[in-house]
Amino acid sequence: MRLLGLDVGSKTVGVAESDPLGWTAQAVEIIPIDEEAEVFGLERVAELVKSRQVAGFVLGLPKNMNNTEGPRVEAARHYGELLEERFGLPIDYQDERLTTVQAHRMLVEEADVSRRKQKKVIDELAATLILQNYLDCHGKLCAKL
């Protein structure tokens, strides 16, 4: 069984998965969504749940630096509710403050990735960092693995 880590944006959802033992997170893909049109990519998530034997979801929670919650937190929680309704699998949230900044820094400073390529992989890498941080902290869903 695996966990899926999700970095939910307004146009894309970055997806990462844990290994079966819950030690490492790997990038999977980016799912296009359209919040305004209420297109959330749940069909693709369903395919991933089935093919990867998913036991639960970890969603990034984009809190403000002062620990307050803004509209993106509401959007992430709404996406979590949609997942829970559709799949009936447990959901947990991981503070994702600075993960996109960290992902950007990794791509620019460590991998020297072009700006064009960064846009294609930043959400995947952010999802991977969210899930890896969760696994490292032994989040409550880790017991499901």
Swiss-Prot record:
Show the Pfam families listed in the entry.
RuvX (PF03652)
> Which GO terms are recorded in the biological process aspect for this UniProt protein?
rRNA 5'-end processing
Q: What is its EC number?
A: 3.1.-.-
Task: Give the record's GO CC terms.
Answer: cytosol
Q: Does the keyword GTP-binding apply?
A: no
The similarity annotation says:
Belongs to the YqgF nuclease family.
One term of GO molecular function: nuclease activity
Q: Which UniProt keywords apply?
A: Cytoplasm, Hydrolase, Nuclease, Ribosome biogenesis
Upper lineage ranks?
Answer: Bacteria, Bacillati, Bacillota, Bacilli, Lactobacillales
Q: What is this protein called?
A: Putative pre-16S rRNA nuclease
Q: What is the main EC category here?
A: hydrolase
Secretion signal span: none
Where does it live in the cell? Cytoplasm
- InterPro entries in the cross-refs: RNaseH-like_sf, YqgF, YqgF/RNaseH-like_dom, YqgF/RNaseH-like_dom_sf
Its function, per the record, reads:
Could be a nuclease involved in processing of the 5'-end of pre-16S rRNA.
